[in-house]
Regions:
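Conserved nucleotide-cofactor-binding alpha/beta core module
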Residues: 99, 115-118
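Charged, compositionally biased N-terminal leader segments and the immediate start
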Residues: 1-12
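Catalytic metal-binding acidic patch
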Residues: 119-128
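Helical scaffold of the NTase/Pol beta-like nucleotidyltransferase catalytic core
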Residues: 3-4, 16-110
Length: 128
């Protein structure tokens, strides 16, 4: 079981905060982190953190590498999330344009606005 403090440390790291992840990376159970991220709809967000870990803590990752099948699965899910976000953004933009052409002032209240608060807006699960 992953310690809650390790999860919150990792989430802070994913938010872009400068956190020493060396001890966490050395001991983390990647499958448990994947399960947690999946249940919380944070797969894309956490994958961005993992990509950052690969750059900043490569030596620690060599000591505790993620299994290839898990990495490929996670990468695939992250790509699906990015594609979904692109589609939702296009649809929201078209809807906005249609409403404006009809003379309506509008504001589309969709979760995509929340994505702007993420370090990478395309990593937020669009919830479709």
């Amino acid at each position: 079981m992953i310690k809650t403090s390790a999860i919150f440390l990792f989430l802070n790291y994913c938010l872009g905060k400068k956190v020493d992840m060396s001890m966490v990376v050395a001991k983390i159970d990647w499958r448990q982190l994947y399960t947690f991220a999946s249940r919380q709809a944070l797969l894309g967000f956490c994958f961005d953190g993992i990509e950052r870990l690969a750059k900043e803590f490569s030596e620690e990752l060599k000591q505790n590498p993620m299994e290839r099948d898990l990495l490929m699965t996670w990468m695939g899910k992250a790509q699906q999330i990015r594609r979904q976000n692109i589609k939702v953004n296009v649809v929201a933009s078209k809807l906005y344009s249609m409403l404006r052409e009809d003379g309506l002032r509008c504001c589309i209240l969709k979760g995509q606005g929340n994505a702007l608060m993420y370090p990478n807006a395309y990593s937020r699960n669009p919830g479709i």
